[in-house]
Regions:
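A composition-driven surface/loop motif
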Residues: 1-200
Length: 200
């Protein structure tokens, strides 16, 4: 699948309960934006994939995202990723989930003009958390590699980060095995639907 939208999101979810995007085995998918976001309704669309609802990406295929303006993937609720290979280049945030970012597994190469992973909820201090159970992360960010307004929990995974300075300036850093835990955040016991409701 190859989708480019010169003036808005390549994928826009206006209203839904839960949304699943499945990367089929051996598939190579490319989504991009031309660099502008024209208003189509009251929502501030500002990413290649933009969802007002809970969004889950699963499967074992690959997804390449190029955001000449704005973010790579945005969910205004929970952003859940259970697997797949992701190459994201974004002018702003790479992955953004307002209520949470929850990652079970996957391979991530993200280059971003701000934070590579960003979760922030100004209205609810219990949300805005990042929970990562595992995966491989190669993050190059002008801001933070991983930023959360709430708790941050890294259970496992391999992390290589080059950051320009958000919460603090950083040099190249690589870490394998269990990461730091900032609190319980949400659970990762069951991929898919359960991931989106745990921690509520």
């Amino acid at each position: 699948v190859v989708i480019n939208n010169d003036s808005s999101a390549a994928v826009y979810v206006q209203s839904a309960d839960k949304v699943f995007i499945t990367l089929a085995p051996d598939s190579e998918n490319k989504l991009s934006n031309g660099g502008t976001y024209e208003a189509v309704d009251d929502n501030n669309i500002d990413s290649v994939i933009f969802s007002k609802s809970d969004l889950t990406l699963n499967g074992s295929g690959s997804l390449t995202i190029t955001a000449k303006a704005g973010h790579g993937i945005v969910s205004k609720d929970d952003l859940v990723i259970t697997g797949g290979t992701y190459a994201i280049t974004a002018a702003s945030q790479g992955l953004s989930g307002k209520d949470s970012i929850r990652i079970l597994d996957g391979d991530f190469t993200i280059t971003s003009g701000k934070d590579a992973l960003h979760s922030e909820n100004e209205d609810n201090a219990e949300k805005g958390f990042v929970y990562i159970a595992g995966g491989n992360f190669n993050l190059t960010a002008s801001g933070d590699g991983i930023s959360a307004s709430g708790n941050m929990t890294l259970l496992d995974g391999m992390y290589t980060m080059t950051t320009g300075g958000g919460s603090e300036n950083g040099k190249d850093h690589q870490e394998g095995g269990p990461g730091g835990q900032g609190g319980p955040g949400g659970g990762m016991d069951n991929p898919g639907e359960d991931l989106m409701t745990s921690g509520e």
